[in-house]
């Protein structure tokens, strides 16, 4: 089993646990150059709020989407949009990535902006 297969297995197990708990899910999608975050409804099919460094208006403000500062801005933005939609309590789905660097920056910014997880 290689590194990516291990990450995908961890992500699958996390998503199963979150689905059993019937909680809103804050999911992080990370690439080398961009980061995205989406808040899913408890059923897992409806996106309640989303933010990404690939959004046109954010690309002007964020020069490099692959660093911790960009991740923090995305975390703050997705949290504001989720709170506006009425979602405060979420389960954090880090997609099998370690809680470090960009993932940690996004999570801390989302907590500061009002999400609880």
From Swiss-Prot:
Coiled-coil regions, chain positions: none
Keyword Transcription regulation set for record: no
Recorded GO CC terms: cytosolic large ribosomal subunit
GO molecular function: 5S rRNA binding; structural constituent of ribosome
Disulfides per UniProt: none
GO annotation terms (biological process): translation
Keywords, ordered alphabetically: Ribonucleoprotein, Ribosomal protein, RNA-binding, rRNA-binding
Any matching Pfam family: Ribosomal_L18p
InterPro entries: Ribosomal_uL18_bac-type, Ribosomal_uL18_bac/euk
Subunit-structure text: Part of the 50S ribosomal subunit; part of the 5S rRNA/L5/L18/L25 subcomplex. Contacts the 5S and 23S rRNAs.
UniProt xrefs under HAMAP family: Ribosomal_uL18_B (MF_01337_B)
Family label: Belongs to the universal ribosomal protein uL18 family.
Protein task: This is one of the proteins that bind and probably mediate the attachment of the 5S RNA into the large ribosomal subunit, where it forms part of the central protuberance.
Name by which UniProt lists this protein: Large ribosomal subunit protein uL18
Gene that this sequence comes from: rplR
């Amino acid at each position: 089993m290689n590194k990516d297969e291990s990450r995908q297995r961890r992500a699958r197990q996390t998503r199963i646990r979150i689905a059993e708990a019937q909680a809103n899910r804050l999911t992080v999608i990370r690439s080398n150059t961009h980061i995205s975050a989406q808040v899913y409804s408890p059923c897992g099919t409806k996106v309640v709020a989303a933010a990404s460094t690939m959004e046109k208006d954010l690309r002007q403000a964020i020069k490099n989407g692959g660093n911790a500062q960009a991740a923090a801005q995305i975390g703050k933005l997705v949290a504001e949009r989720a709170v506006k939609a009425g979602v405060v309590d979420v389960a954090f789905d880090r997609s099998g990535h370690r809680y470090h660097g960009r993932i940690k920056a996004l999570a801390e910014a989302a907590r500061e902006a009002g999400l609880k997880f």
